[in-house]
Swiss-Prot record:
Encoding gene (name): uvrC
Broad class of the protein's primary localization: cytoplasm
Subcellular location: Cytoplasm
Keywords for the protein's UniProt record, in alphabetical order: Cytoplasm, DNA damage, DNA excision, DNA repair, Excision nuclease, SOS response
Naturally occurring in which organism (per UniProt): Aromatoleum aromaticum (strain DSM 19018 / LMG 30748 / EbN1) (Azoarcus sp. (strain EbN1))
Presence of keyword DNA damage: yes
Complex and partners: Interacts with UvrB in an incision complex.
Protein's name according to its UniProt entry: UvrABC system protein C
A Pfam family that the UniProt record links to this protein: UvrC_RNaseH
Residues in GIY-YIG domain copies: 19-97
Origin: domain of life: Bacteria
GO biological process: nucleotide-excision repair; SOS response
The UniProt record lists the keyword DNA repair: yes
Length: 602
């Protein structure tokens, strides 16, 4: 190992580095970790830092401080990625640039069901389903789903609704669904529509239009004029959309445009996505720390993080020097990609749009930051705090007559909601409907861990409730030794009207703020988010608890019998109201099965 005060001998060190996946750590003076990185080939990746020329002054400055490089070979790239993430979180290296984005990129899902469902999707992929994306934003997904519904009329309903319908829904009436739920289209015809939709999502729009045009002519020759007209309408819809969204009509291209823009001390990297020639929109992102970060460093960090998790398109257009990007892409990507700077007119238009949107994002960020600071300062003055509360945690309780009680904790940092730190708690072991006991339990679970050294201590706690809830919360904080944390309750106003809330302090004081007070607006925003997060969790828990009352979970009831039952009685409520004798009259339902149905629904 090299002595701390000796110059680092990179050449000698590199001879010892294996060509294996792993994690490397650049160590500087006082054993301070300068940088943590992951590589699929440690030797090649670490060697790239010690070339004669560096990609940027920031990297050159880091390399000049290196006294040692520690490496940890791993069994796979996936293991290296996990280790790298853990080390970055625990060591907080100075030269790591992180793009923190609480929301994952959205996808379009085609489920693996007999009649596949078209759906918006975030999160982990389900086995058997097909996914198309990523899309830069929710709007792009929603618009694409709307287009696919209008053109190919695929179902979007969830399986419980699909399996229990006895008549077509409104979407069928407005020609947005072919109603496979009630057998108005057979499996083969529906599968053909699914194939066309999949090809369109894969960027093969021209093939889809050619296919539909051929179908139209074939139908016309058979004198099937209604079918021909339907194909004609599909072609017109697709052509109209493509005419509006194509930014280069010469070919169906898959391109990512990455623009790095610096305004003052703020750097923004914007990624715009073109799939099959359609411009899907863009997504500006900001590094977690911007001091001293140039456009090249920000772009390289974004490219490395983004394409570790997302598929590389056929073409990547950047506005920074190609050489360092090419070295990075060779390291992190297995498939070839054409790397370009804008030269053609269409490419310059794409990049200009991306750069302009990055500048607009910087302006919006500055405006939002100023607004958040103003609201936090108003809250500090209102609550008479020494400093503006950077981290605020808010709690709410949700249940239905004591059933399936769920507590929520949402987090706001510097005036912005931190979705990745939200938590839900299933409340058990209390008297149903006892909100005070529920609040006590969630706070004990949350702040018992904080008192033990796990988690982060907030600057302010908001409690959705009045004096009783605040009293319970105050007691818990005293029990765990955290009574010094500022806390306030938010009691609902008359008829729960916004703007009439009352602030309830632990000492019993109560205060009302003006309806236009910026501190009240911040409190309302955080409180409403806690309520939303609690009630969605409660509904999911309640639905799960009641799932046994649905027909599909009754032994002996398959899809055909379920459909016959719903058709005979007009829906689940009608089945529930039927007697055993009524149920026996349905074809295929024996008395034993009828009794099982009756017992399950009562």
């Amino acid at each position: 190992m090299t002595a701390p005060d000796a110059p680092f001998d990179a050449r000698a060190f590199l001879r010892t580095v294996p060509e294996e996946p792993g994690v490397y750590r650049m160590i500087g003076a006082d054993e301070r970790v300068l940088y943590v990185g992951k590589a699929k080939n440690l030797k090649r990746r670490v060697s790239s830092y010690f070339q004669r020329t560096q990609p940027s002054p920031r990297i050159a400055m880091m390399v000049a401080q290196i006294l040692r490089v520690d490496i940890t070979p791993t069994r796979s790239e996936a293991e290296a990625l996990l280790l790298e993430n853990n080390l970055i979180k625990s060591l907080a290296p100075r030269y790591n640039i992180l793009f923190r984005d609480d929301k994952t990129y959205p996808y379009i899902e085609l489920s693996g069901d007999e009649f596949p469902r078209l759906a918006y999707h975030r999160g982990a992929f389900t086995k058997g389903a097909r996914y198309f994306g990523p899309f830069p934003n929710v709007w792009a997904v929603r618009e694409s789903i709307h287009l696919l519904q209008k053109t190919f009329r695929l179902r979007t309903c969830e399986n419980p609704v699909f399996q229990n319908r006895s008549r077509p829904c409104l979407l069928h009436q407005i020609k947005r669904c072919t109603a496979p739920c009630v057998g108005l289209i057979d499996k083969e015809a529906y599968a053909a529509d699914v194939r066309l939709a999949a090809r369109f999502l894969e960027g093969r729009a021209s093939e889809v239009i050619d296919d539909l045009t051929a179908r139209m002519h074939a139908a016309a020759e058979r004198l099937a004029f209604e079918e021909a007209a339907a194909c004609r309408d599909q072609v017109r819809v697709l052509q109209a959309v493509l005419a509006r969204q194509f930014v280069d009509s010469r070919k169906d291209e898959d391109v990512d445009i990455i623009a790095a823009v610096e305004e003052g001390s703020v750097t923004c990297v914007n990624i715009a996505m073109v799939r099959g020639g359609r411009h899907l929109g863009d997504r500006p992102q900001f590094p977690s720390a911007t001091a001293g970060i140039g456009m090249l460093d920000a772009a390289l960090a974004f490219i490395e993080q983004h394409y570790r998790e997302h598929e590389l398109p056929a073409k990547l257009l950047v506005d920074v020097p190609l050489a360092p990007v090419r070295v990075l892409m060779d390291e992190i990507c297995d498939k070839p990609c054409t790397l370009l700077v804008p030269r053609l007119q269409a490419e310059k238009v794409w990049m200009g749009m991306a750069e302009n949107n990055a500048r607009l994002a910087i302006i919006a960020r500055a405006r939002d930051t100023g607004r958040a600071e103003m609201r936090l300062e108003a809250l500090r003055e209102t609550l008479d705090l020494a400093e503006a509360p950077r981290r605020i945690e808010c709690f709410d309780i949700s249940h239905t007559m004591g059933e399936a009680t769920v507590a929520s904790c949402v987090v706001s940092v510097d005036g912005a909601m931190k979705n990745s730190e939200y938590r839900r708690y299933n409340i058990t072991g209390i008297t149903p409907g006892d909100d005070f006991a529920a609040m006590r339990q969630v706070l004990e679970r949350r702040y018992g861990k904080v008192a033990a050294g796990e988690g982060v201590c907030p600057d302010l706690i908001l409690i959705d409730g009045g004096k009783g809830q605040v009293s319970s919360a105050r007691s818990v904080l005293a029990d765990v030794g955290l009574e010094s944390i500022a806390m306030v309750g938010v009691a609902k106003g008359e008829e729960r009207k916004p703007g009439l809330e009352t602030l309830v302090f632990p000492d019993g004081r109560m205060q009302n703020l003006a309806i236009d007070h910026p501190a009240l607006h911040l409190i309302q925003e955080i409180r409403d988010e806690a309520h939303r997060f609690a009630i969605t969790g409660h509904r999911a828990r309640r639905a799960k608890a009641r799932i046994g009352s649905r027909l599909e979970d009754i032994p002996g009831i398959g899809p055909m019998r379920r459909r016959n039952l719903l058709a005979s009685f007009g829906g689940l409520d009608g089945v529930r109201a039927a007697t055993v004798e009524d149920l026996c009259r349905v074809g295929g339902v024996s008395r034993k099965t009828a009794e099982a149905i009756y017992n399950a629904l009562h």
